[in-house]
Amino acid sequence: MAFGPAAMGYDRAITIFSPDGSLYQVDYAFEAVKKGWTAIGIKSKSGVVIASEKRKAQSLLDVDSIEKVFLIDDHVGCSFAGLASDGRVLIDYARNIALQHRLIYDEPVSIDYLTKSVADVKQMYTQHGGVRPFGVALVIAGIDKSVPKLYMTEPSGQYMPYQAVAIGQGYYTATEFLEKNYKEDLTIEDTILLALKALSATLKPNEKLTPNTVEIGYASTQTGLFLKMTSEDKNMYLQKL
């Protein structure tokens, strides 16, 4: 995204709107999200699934050390696309919110409240000088009292509930795939397969998903627990694609 000299004053200041109603630094934060690895969230009647790709950014990097699906509390998890350091900070914040809620109220935090709390922090960083927006979008999913919940938060602080959502480099292709193939009455197994198929659709023709290049988290309405899938289980589902 490029702007001419007339726009430079609005470009430098985070708190000043341009004449066309834009906050350019927030727009740039959205561009950072589009450069991130693709992550997909799907909600069905049987539960929720988050699937995210992992790539080796450097040849000597230990890919096993890369984490792309995160447990926030027993019933909720998340993934992100964008700046990894920004994602880590917001995930730690979400975990603290969940922990404080358990300590004070002796019950799991609602996913609605958790998402709003994270989105509020993001929004605050769009209206104060001396800071910059978070260059990251989060997919938050889990089970609230046997009800599946799925949200996505944007760098602007906006958050919305979704049936299915994609973020990152392949969001456009994945969204098109999900719009054509999504069904609400999927089993949790079929929801996992749909997420993997949507993620596969974003790859180049000579690429394919492997247990080392994808992370999957899921929660079913039967257990209410958000779990990360093992390599053995990932391999089993990938063989069904």
UniProtKB/Swiss-Prot annotation:
Keywords: Cytoplasm, Proteasome. Coiled coil: none annotated. GO terms for molecular function: threonine-type endopeptidase activity. GO terms for cellular component: cytoplasm; proteasome core complex, alpha-subunit complex. PROSITE patterns: PROTEASOME_ALPHA_1, PROTEASOME_ALPHA_2. The keyword Cytoplasm applies. Its main location: cytoplasm. GO terms for biological process: proteasomal protein catabolic process; ubiquitin-dependent protein catabolic process. InterPro entries: Ntn_hydrolases_N, Proteasome_alpha, Proteasome_alpha-type, Proteasome_asu_arc, Proteasome_asu_N, Proteasome_sua/b. It is found in: Cytoplasm. It comes from the Archaea. The keyword Transcription regulation does not apply. Pfam families: Proteasome, Proteasome_A_N. The formation of the proteasomal ATPase PAN-20S proteasome complex, via the docking of the C-termini of PAN into the intersubunit pockets in the alpha-rings, triggers opening of the gate for substrate entry. Interconversion between the open-gate and close-gate conformations leads to a dynamic regulation of the 20S proteasome proteolysis activity. Component of the proteasome core, a large protease complex with broad specificity involved in protein degradation. Belongs to the peptidase T1A family. The 20S proteasome core is composed of 14 alpha and 14 beta subunits that assemble into four stacked heptameric rings, resulting in a barrel-shaped structure. The two inner rings, each composed of seven catalytic beta subunits, are sandwiched by two outer rings, each composed of seven alpha subunits. The catalytic chamber with the active sites is on the inside of the barrel. Has a gated structure, the ends of the cylinder being occluded by the N-termini of the alpha-subunits. Is capped at one or both ends by the proteasome regulatory ATPase, PAN. This is Proteasome subunit alpha. The gene is psmA.
